[in-house]
């Protein structure tokens, strides 16, 4: 399963290796709320030991929690986000992005006639968008949790949602 490729342990190791070279907030891209919850549990000890807070950021959170994640803070933050943070938000102070390379997309299964959220690899375009979140207002750094060979094999861009449905006959 594609979602088993990146574990909370991978994230913790990547964060630990990159944290010292960063002064701002870290933005970690994960595919969904479940992965965010598991990563938050794993990273809480690291964050506490480094004077930071772990904050989730996804569309199913109550507005107050989303606002807390986005609010300016003198404390360093580890923001665990879905692709909602890829293009629609500017988060001040982020200078480190850790990218799982995964996203959840709605896909139609023509065999069953059911729409399901699937965890998929992102495109090269999405990877660049995510990398651009680091250092929007200064120098930044991105850690991709996949190899250059895997990056070269990614689609150039996502198929638009309407096209995904059109290809399945919906």
Which residues fall in each region the model found?
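P-loop NTPase motor module signature
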Residues: 1-170
